Amino acid sequence: YLVNPAAYAALGAYMFLLILIGFPINFLTLYVTLEHKKLRTPLNYILLNLAVANLFMVLGGFTTTMYTSMHGYFVLGRLGCNLEAFFATLGGEIALWSLVVLAIERWIVVCKPISNFRFTEDHAIMGLAFTWVMALACAVPPLVGWSRYIPEGMQCSCGVDYYTRAEGFNNESFVIYMFIVHFLIPLSVIFFCYGRLLCAVKEAPAAQQESETTQRAEKEVSRMVVIMVIGFLVCWLPYASVAWWIFCNQGSDFGPIFMTLPSFFAKSAAIYNPMIYICMNKQFRHCMI
């Protein structure tokens, strides 16, 4: 054991809790949306996409991590490590790029930079395809030799190799690519869209043709998406910051817990998105009941 066995027991229990909440809540989101026609709006396709990404994380990643934390090290070998890290990365990236698509959708609908634009089913499907392409562009390279997935922290879960400059893997270039293309750029787009959105909401009453109910509905959706973004940042920023610090200070000393805590905190992302969605979407709650 790298650390006190009790820490592994706590980790296992935490993962069990995440599976216990994460699976039903994401499955419910999927099921209710597919069951009720009126919920099948283009915007909800993206939220469905988030639920699918979370299920990937729960089934592909969390189950593996719970199993390995019972053993105190990563027992599933190279293949298991690759699979677990792939699903965790894919899920996290689909969530991030889905938030980008939602942010762009909010910006276009509320700020109307393109007049007479309607967010249709085709746009939603293009948005979905885009999130998957971008997520795969981040999760696949370590499987095919550009960087690699290795056990991290307490060695119960795997992630991208920020730790070493291993020969032949080009870790540095991948980590820099990942941070810029799959973290900074999406966040910049999200912040740009919400910056414009806040300005538009302030200027809105002066130039409004739409009914009050439409406005209220748009505001509610915007509020929900903003809270999802804040939730994403709360979950993923500590992990990204620690990973970047380790990458910049390779060879310096840090304990296994240092990387484990933010990494496992980030995993809670699979629960909060559907919770926000269920808590803030009246129509969804009615259909659920």
Swiss-Prot record:
Q: Which residues lie on this side of the membrane: Extracellular?
A: 1-7, 68-81, 145-173, 246-257
Any idea which UniProt keywords this protein has? Cell projection, Chromophore, Disulfide bond, G-protein coupled receptor, Glycoprotein, Lipoprotein, Membrane, Phosphoprotein, Photoreceptor protein, Receptor, Retinal protein, Sensory transduction, Transducer, Transmembrane, Transmembrane helix, Vision
Q: List the disulfide bonds.
A: C81-C158
* Described purpose of this protein according to its UniProt entry: Photoreceptor required for image-forming vision at low light intensity. While most salt water fish species use retinal as chromophore, most freshwater fish use 3-dehydroretinal, or a mixture of retinal and 3-dehydroretinal. Light-induced isomerization of 11-cis to all-trans retinal triggers a conformational change that activates signaling via G-proteins. Subsequent receptor phosphorylation mediates displacement of the bound G-protein alpha subunit by arrestin and terminates signaling.
Please name the Pfam families in this protein's record: 7tm_1
**Residues exposed to the Cytoplasmic side:** 33-44, 105-123, 196-223, 280-289
Query: Which family is annotated?
Result: Belongs to the G-protein coupled receptor 1 family. Opsin subfamily.
Query: PANTHER family recorded for this chain?
Result: OPSIN
Reported modifications of this chain? Phosphorylated on some or all of the serine and threonine residues present in the C-terminal region. Contains one covalently linked retinal chromophore.
Q: What is this protein called?
A: Rhodopsin
Among the GO biological process terms of this entry, one is:
G protein-coupled opsin signaling pathway
**Species for this entry:** Abyssocottus korotneffi (Baikalian deep-water sculpin)
For this UniProt entry, which segments traverse the membrane? 8-32, 45-67, 82-104, 124-144, 174-195, 224-245, 258-279
Enumerate the PROSITE patterns for this protein: G_PROTEIN_RECEP_F1_1, G_PROTEIN_RECEP_F1_2, OPSIN
Q: How does it sit in the membrane?
A: Multi-pass membrane protein
The record ties this protein, via InterPro entries, to: GPCR_opsins, GPCR_Rhodpsn, GPCR_Rhodpsn_7TM, Opsin, Retinal_BS, Rhodopsin
Q: Where is this motif: 'Ionic lock' involved in activated form stabilization?
A: 105-107
Q: Name one GO molecular function term.
A: 11-cis retinal binding
Question: Which residues, renumbered to this chain, carry the PTM N6-(retinylidene)lysine?
Answer: K267
Query: What's in the GO CC field?
Result: membrane; photoreceptor disc membrane; plasma membrane
Protein location: Membrane; Cell projection, Cilium, Photoreceptor outer segment
List the gene name.
rho
What are the glycosylated positions? N171
Site description Plays an important role in the conformation switch to the active conformation, residues in chain: E84
